[in-house]
């Protein structure tokens, strides 16, 4: 008699990961719950999340392991985030956390300690294998309002081969309904709306102030004229309008954060747009790196609408993205540009710079 396959369910203590664990158990897997202990304090990634995850595992009658990676989280995510803001960019910690921790350290723990090579998570995304290309693909979730493929673009082929996304074909409402039907203790738990770091600190401002010394500096326009004073350049990001504290006859937006000179550059909305951008650390997902430029739909922020663009591959895992129809607003260095063909993620990379030429 063949035994049922084993799978690790990554459990944060939230409704999504809990339902994902219940679904793979229902599909016949022998499930082992694993929760990553990321930081001290209360919240979804701290003690509250671990307690809720433990209760769910008890309800599902599956074993539960807690893996203490607080030091690795500090080094891999916190330091990365702080250094990025010091440099005047807007880092994307969630994609890094997915690659390095959830499908990095967690998968390594599953293989080494549990002898399990597959991980199910509560991400809203889809994946599979294309026999024609010989590649594992990544695609948007059915629920476009909750789709998280943007944050998963950097997963390697090996990581995608080990990933299971049980919620990819479901809507958030269906997930909530199923959690209630199963009687899960987290069925009505409120959804976390912030980064786990922000949740623990109370706000992004609090988090940054705890890690970066505040230095006042100048707010200038694109010609260098001084318009006002800021309370720390790390509190500003490209495209920001609120909180500038500068009077002008037209709305002002952050055009650039000049960390080297401790300046925040502002201008009219059109001055915060770009016709192209360059990206680095490119990861090609559902297709191999092409030899020639390709057409694709590009998303330059998590909530931005995809726009038609030309992707020109560059050496050293780089690419240039030229927007075909119109300049794009608020292209922030440090964020990801992810390109799609329909629902499938073709690739993505970290935005390095943008231009209007």
Curated annotation (Swiss-Prot):
Spell out the InterPro entries in the cross-references: MnmA-like, MnmA-like_C, MnmA-like_central, MnmA-like_central_sf, Rossmann-like_a/b/a_fold
Superkingdom is: Bacteria
| UniProt xrefs under Pfam families | tRNA_Me_trans, tRNA_Me_trans_C, tRNA_Me_trans_M
Q: Where is this region: Interaction with tRNA?
A: 146-148, 301-302
Marked site positions, Interaction with tRNA? 123, 335
Q: What is its EC number?
A: 2.8.1.13
Give GO BP annotations, semicolon-separated.
Answer: tRNA wobble position uridine thiolation
Residues where ATP binds: 10-17, 36, 122
Active-site residues per Swiss-Prot or TrEMBL entry: 97, 196
Could you list this entry's UniProt keywords, alphabetically sorted: ATP-binding, Cytoplasm, Disulfide bond, Nucleotide-binding, RNA-binding, Transferase, tRNA processing, tRNA-binding
The reaction(s) catalysed by this protein are: S-sulfanyl-L-cysteinyl-[protein] + uridine(34) in tRNA + AH2 + ATP = 2-thiouridine(34) in tRNA + L-cysteinyl-[protein] + A + AMP + diphosphate + H(+)
Its localization reads: Cytoplasm
Q: What class of enzyme is it?
A: transferase
* GO MF term set: ATP binding; tRNA binding; tRNA-uridine 2-sulfurtransferase activity
Please tell me one Gene Ontology term that the record gives under cellular component. Answer: cytoplasm
Tell me the disulfide pairings in this chain: 97-196
Its annotated function is as follows: Catalyzes the 2-thiolation of uridine at the wobble position (U34) of tRNA, leading to the formation of s(2)U34.
Which family does the UniProt entry place this protein in?
Belongs to the MnmA/TRMU family.
Q: What is this protein called?
A: tRNA-specific 2-thiouridylase MnmA
- Species this chain originates from: Gloeobacter violaceus (strain ATCC 29082 / PCC 7421)
Query: What is the taxonomic lineage of the source species?
Result: Bacteria, Bacillati, Cyanobacteriota, Cyanophyceae, Gloeobacterales
């Amino acid at each position: 008699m063949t035994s049922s396959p084993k799978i690790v369910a990554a459990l944060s203590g939230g409704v999504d990961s809990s339902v994902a664990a219940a679904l793979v158990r229902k599909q016949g897997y022998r499930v082992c719950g694993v929760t990553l202990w990321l930081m001290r304090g209360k919240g979804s990634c701290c003690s509250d999340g671990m307690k809720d995850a433990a209760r769910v595992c008890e309800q599902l009658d599956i074993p539960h392991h807690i893996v203490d990676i607080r030091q690795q989280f500090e080094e891999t995510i916190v330091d990365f985030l702080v250094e990025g803001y010091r440099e005047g960019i807007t880092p994307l910690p969630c994609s890094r956390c997915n690659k390095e921790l959830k499908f990095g350290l967690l998968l390594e723990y599953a293989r080494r300690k549990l002898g399990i090579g597959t991980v199910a998570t509560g991400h809203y995304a889809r994946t599979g294998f294309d026999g024609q290309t010989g590649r594992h693909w990544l695609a948007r979730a059915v629920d476009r309002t909750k789709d998280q493929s943007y944050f998963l673009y950097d997963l390697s082929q090996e990581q995608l081969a080990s990933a299971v996304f049980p919620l990819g074909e479901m809507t958030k409402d269906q997930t909530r309904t199923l959690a209630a039907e199963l009687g899960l203790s987290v069925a009505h738990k409120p959804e976390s709306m912030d980064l786990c770091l922000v949740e623990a600190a109370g706000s992004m401002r609090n988090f940054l102030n705890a890690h970066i010394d505040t230095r006042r500096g100048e707010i200038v326009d694109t010609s260098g004229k001084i318009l006002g004073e800021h309370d720390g350049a790390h509190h500003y990001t490209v495209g920001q309008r609120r909180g500038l504290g500068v009077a002008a006859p037209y709305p002002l937006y952050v055009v650039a954060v000049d960390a080297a000179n401790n300046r925040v550059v502002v201008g009219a909305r059109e001055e915060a747009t770009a016709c192209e951008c360059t990206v680095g650390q490119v990861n090609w997902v559902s297709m191999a790196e092409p030899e020639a430029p390709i057409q694709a739909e590009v998303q330059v922020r998590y909530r931005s609408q995809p726009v038609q663009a030309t992707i020109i591959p560059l050496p050293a895992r780089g690419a240039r993205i030229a927007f075909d129809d119109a300049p794009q607003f608020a292209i922030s260095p440090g964020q990801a540009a992810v390109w799609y063909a329909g629902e499938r993620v073709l690739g993505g990379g970290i935005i390095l710079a943008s231009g209007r030429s």
